[in-house]
Curated annotation (Swiss-Prot):
One GO term describing the cellular component: cytosol
Source organism of this protein record: Haloarcula marismortui (strain ATCC 43049 / DSM 3752 / JCM 8966 / VKM B-1809)
Annotated FMN binding sites: 125-127, 288, 303-307, 330
EC code: 4.2.3.5
Keyword presence, Ribosomal protein: no
UniProt-recorded name of the protein: Chorismate synthase
CC cofactor: FMNH2
Taxonomic lineage: Archaea, Methanobacteriati, Methanobacteriota, Stenosarchaea group, Halobacteria
Length: 399
């Protein structure tokens, strides 16, 4: 199975199934000298983990991360970083009825059609549980960005559940208020209504869709490449890879379809530092597929979860007959509240990858951070002076 990697220089490779022993990922391309905190990664994993509230799945996973390679004395060494998260509450028995009877609108049939087999416990690799790896990798990316010379800030919040939409909020509102309620919406009044909508659908044995607004500040201009490596095309790949996502837009998004060119065009002016900057930001910080230096923003939308305890019609390919099934596992009635850290993680991974590719961050080690050894060439040093070679060799032997 291909497609388990994301990124070019900052590269995440993941493994694990929903009801297997563990989830895990390897992150390569992290510069040496980054002070990496397992606790900071855990904070984001705690925001994503199940069982947080009555509107999330009741699966009891602590999602504790263990870093098992790539760091020494709290700092990255430049080698691949390995992270493992154990599955503690897997219950595959409830999925046995679906071994030969695919659940509607899941990956059960399509995985079987492609590979001739599949891990049927909880959907295996197709489960959204796999995003726990993405959040762990994103936690690494965030720390690299925070310790770089750029003040990159990333934040997201739930902007819609069902028909309830949040009012306008600022970046500061998201930083201060999005974690104050279980919906993760920075608009407190809308959050209460969203909570009621999710709760009502859950009581009815149903589910509902929603959307997340994201914003990234501090990204320099010049990231991205024309055409197939443009910033939005790579960011779109990241967001569409998230399970159940069915729409991604940046800038004013779909509003651009009804906006006149004279209104959508952004003129240029000099900012207070004398740098060219667009007037306005309907383009979401991107022009010609390359970043302008303005905030990058947009929305990601989810369809309603399709694992619901209502009777559904399917077929049994073993008996060749139709069959009624009920999905009785533990599932979320709405996805965006737990997906906020997933969106932030994939945005962080994308931004860091582009900054490494563009040379904005040293891919070997963070600039300005002293290494353990001085690697500069000094002609007068013993190892480069033939007359001192014997003395130097004796010193090594004595050690």
């Amino acid at each position: 199975m291909n497609g388990n990697e994301f990124g070019r220089l900052f590269r995440m490779t993941t493994y694990g199934e929903s009801h297997g022993e563990a989830m895990g990922c390897t992150v390569s391309g992290v510069p040496a000298g980054v002070e990496l905190s397992e606790e900071e990664i855990q904070k984001d994993l705690d925001r994503r983990k199940p069982g947080q509230s009555m509107i999330t799945t009741s699966r009891g996973e602590p999602d504790k991360v263990t870093i098992n390679s790539g760091i020494q004395d709290g700092y990255t060494t430049g080698t691949p970083i390995g992270m493992v998260i154990q599955n503690k509450d897997a219950r595959s028995g409830k999925y046995e009825p679906f071994i030969t009877a695919p659940r509607p609108s899941h990956g059960d049939y399509t995985y079987s059609a492609k590979f001739g087999t599949r891990n049927w416990g909880g959907g295996g690799r197709s489960s959204a549980r796999e995003t726990v790896n993405w959040v762990a990798a994103g936690g690494v990316a965030k720390q690299v960005l925070e310790q770089s010379d750029y003040d990159v800030q990333i934040k997201a919040h739930v902007c819609q559940i069902g028909d309830v939409e949040a009012g306008p909020v600022t970046f500061e509102d998201m930083l201060e208020h999005s974690e104050e309620n279980e919906v993760r919406c920075a608009d407190p009044e809308a959050a209460e209504e969203m909570r009621d909508v999710a709760d009502q659908h859950q009581k009815e044995g149903d589910s509902i869709g929603g959307a997340i607004y994201f914003e990234c500040r501090g990204v320099p201009s010049g990231l991205g490449a024309p055409r197939f490596d443009s910033f939005p095309s790579r960011l779109g790949q990241a967001m569409y890879s998230i399970p159940a996502v069915n729409d991604f837009e940046y800038g004013i998004g779909r509003e651009a379809r009804t906006t006149k060119g004279s209104e959508y065009t952004e003129n240029w002016e000099f900012d207070e530092d004398g740098h060219p900057t667009p007037v306005g930001n309907d383009h979401g910080g991107i022009q010609g597929g390359i970043t302008t230096g303005q905030p990058i923003y947009g929305e990601v939308s989810w369809h309603a979860p399709v694992s619901i305890p209502k009777t559904q019609e399917t077929v049994d390919w073993e008996t060749g007959e139709g069959k009624e099934i009920t999905v009785t596992g533990r599932h979320d009635p709405v996805l965006p509240p737990r997906a906020v850290p997933v969106v932030e993680a994939m945005l962080a991974c994308t931004v860091l990858d582009f900054m490494l590719l563009g040379g904005r961050i040293n891919p070997d080690r963070l600039d300005g951070r002293p290494g353990e050894y001085d690697t500069d060439y000094h002609p007068s040093s013993p190892q480069n002076d033939p007359e001192d070679a014997d003395t130097h060799a004796k010193t090594i032997d004595d050690d």
